């Protein structure tokens, strides 16, 4: 074994030009394969991330569920994450907007909207706390509001009730929209405690945002029936079930276009590399035949000849493959990050 290895190493060392060219080809091939696979995987992940920002990361939504239905949903093993949003009521001056309580899970699941993002302070936790953008506070007559300030707003719990003054403490300031095309349409966050105080237990309604766990074993082919079956078992009407199809298409269905392009490129690179390495081997093939002939004449068996040729190739890959992997990963990572940054700047 050691003799065969020494002969293989000596052969590679003797044919320096050929060995260097082969090592460069292997290194370049490895590097290109790593770059394509890494960038392709990054593109798929980026598309999924952008889908969450555009459509939200919840699998679905159960609208207007009562307390009993909420408890049933929480018991389901197929449900992974649950977020609760409640409509607090109506604030005068924000009739076309939303006054809601939303827990941290919901805020993470919602599509990106700068009006949901805190600029200062914290989201409401105590009963009388509120968070909104400065545009809202300006619209209701409070200018230069700061975190910790107290404001009195006209509030009613529903269309059937009358407005009444309620004192709130500003817990946070949200970012404002770039332009308000609809009058009195602001995002205002309240707390769950405020909702519980103002709405009787039997009248409370919850919007349940959720994702499914791996145990649900869903795909685009069966996700809708699975979600509807969960709703039925929890006593939720089908008309109150919303499935986030646009997001699920990215999460549950791979990007076939990206995979196909990467597959074609990888196949082309492999074929091209095989041709290049084959042609390099043809250089000085006469001398190699003579060398192998002499070794065989000395009594080498067919198995030993195969081992010799195999080990010559192994010695050439010891250095070239790790270098190709390293440079491929670094180039792919830096190049992909640069492309993403350029895309964000546009």
Predicted features, each with a name:
Residues 42, 46, 284, 334-341:
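Membrane-spanning helices that line or support transport/gating and their immediate boundary helices
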Residues 16-44, 253-294, 313-327:
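Hydrophobic alpha-helical transmembrane segments of multi-pass inner-membrane transport and secretion
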Residues 11-14, 123, 254-255:
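Helix-boundary and loop/linker segments of multi-pass membrane transporters
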Residues 1-6, 303:
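Short, membrane-interfacial amphipathic segments enriched in basic
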Residues 325-346:
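Short helix-loop junctions at transmembrane helix boundaries
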Residues 139, 283, 294-295, 308:
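Short alpha-helical segment immediately N-terminal to, or the first helix within
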Residues 41-249:
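Basic-flanked hydrophobic alpha-helices used for secretion and membrane insertion
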């Amino acid at each position: 074994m050691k003799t065969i290895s020494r002969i293989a190493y000596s052969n590679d060392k003797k044919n320096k030009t050929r060995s260097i060219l082969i090592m460069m080809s292997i290194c370049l091939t490895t590097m290109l394969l790593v770059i394509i696979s890494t960038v392709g995987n990054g593109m798929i992940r980026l598309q999924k991330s952008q889908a969450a920002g555009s459509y939200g990361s919840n699998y679905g939504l159960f609208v207007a569920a009562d307390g009993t239905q909420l408890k049933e949903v929480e018991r389901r093993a197929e449900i992974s994450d649950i977020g609760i949003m409640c409509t607090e009521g109506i604030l005068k001056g924000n009739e076309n907007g939303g006054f809601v309580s939303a827990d941290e899970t919901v805020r993470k699941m919602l599509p990106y909207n700068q009006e949901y993002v805190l600029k200062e302070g914290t989201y409401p936790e105590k009963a009388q706390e509120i968070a909104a953008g400065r545009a809202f506070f300006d619209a209701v007559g409070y200018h230069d509001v700061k975190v910790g300030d107290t404001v009195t707003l006209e509030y009613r719990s529903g269309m059937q009730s009358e407005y009444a003054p309620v004192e709130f403490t500003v817990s946070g300031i949200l970012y404002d929209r770039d332009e308000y095309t609809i009058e009195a349409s602001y995002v205002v966050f309240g707390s769950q405690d405020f909702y519980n105080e103002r709405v009787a237990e039997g009248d409370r309604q919850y919007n349940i945002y959720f994702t499914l766990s791996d145990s649900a074993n869903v795909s685009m082919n069966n996700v809708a029936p699975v979600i509807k079956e969960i709703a039925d078992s929890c006593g939720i009407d089908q008309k109150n079930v919303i499935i986030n199809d646009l997001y699920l298409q990215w999460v549950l269905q791979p990007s076939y276009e990206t995979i196909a392009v990467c597959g074609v490129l990888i196949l082309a690179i492999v074929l091209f590399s095989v041709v290049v390495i084959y042609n390099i081997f043809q250089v000085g093939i006469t001398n190699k035949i003579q060398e192998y002939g002499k070794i065989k004449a000395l009594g080498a068996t067919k198995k030993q000849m195969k081992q010799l040729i195999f080990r010559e190739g192994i010695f050439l890959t010891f250095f070239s493959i790790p270098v190709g992997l390293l440079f491929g990963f670094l180039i792919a990572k830096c190049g992909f990050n640069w492309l993403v940054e350029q895309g964000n700047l546009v």
